[in-house]
């Protein structure tokens, strides 16, 4: 063997083997600020600095006015605000069922997030007192989401809907989540899929990612305790919420399936934790760096 050929093989073989040592996917992890709702506005400097120091790069707000006030601080820390959970009656129009909220025109709310530089306008939840008793309510709600999504699209925002567990409860042989799947405009409405609530309702997050292929723009990450019962209420005992990687959900498989579903942004949201929410966020972030 010539010296030249020997050198070629010595240098090329490690390169040929490199694909076998595939790098972990590049994945930017964010925080849903609902996790730190109890102290955020009282000590925002400390909380946001800690979130940034942990390594989080993206933020999702849990309310428009508070988030907009915090955006300069968030930007100064090198993080980017991507999405915000907005007032449900902006979309549904039933302000009388939300006594603690001041009515605001939908167009005004859209403009506020557009002006603030966000990409997503996200409907987070339909409170129990506002849910109709039959499936026609969900058909009507889907139509109203489509309308809001059209206005968002014209303004340069993406409309999204965040699921919980109640959408998976069967009624009249059909489920609200199936109505949303079939009735929401595929081009205008993205799903913000919460893997915890999908699983709490007895469904497989991976199968749901496949069913909603190309339509899941955002993913909420939190883990579930072993032996947690199937239920369709959000009244879940705090102990059933676990940090990512500390429960029974198959996060390596979920994260592998996410890109094909259309996921662009990943947010850790810890609704309940027995300790310091910031410690909880660090635990989840550290685990996510390993998968």
What are these model-derived regions, one by one?
Residues 24, 49-53, 67-83, 107-118, ...:
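Acidic (Asp/Glu)-rich catalytic clusters
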Residues 153-248:
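Acidic/histidine-rich catalytic cores of soluble enzymes
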Residues 1-16:
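N-terminal secretory signal peptides and thylakoid transit peptides that target proteins
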Residues 18, 58, 91-190, 211, ...:
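Active-site acidic/histidine proton-transfer and metal-coordination neighborhood
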Residues 27-32, 59-61, 81-86, 121-123, ...:
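Hydrophobic faces of well-ordered beta-strands that scaffold small-molecule active sites
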Residues 39-50, 101-112, 202-208, 251:
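Short, acidic/polar
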Residues 34-36, 62-64, 86-89, 126-128, ...:
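Active-site beta-loop-alpha junctions enriched in small/polar residues
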Residues 24-42:
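Boundary/entry segment of secreted carbohydrate-active catalytic domains
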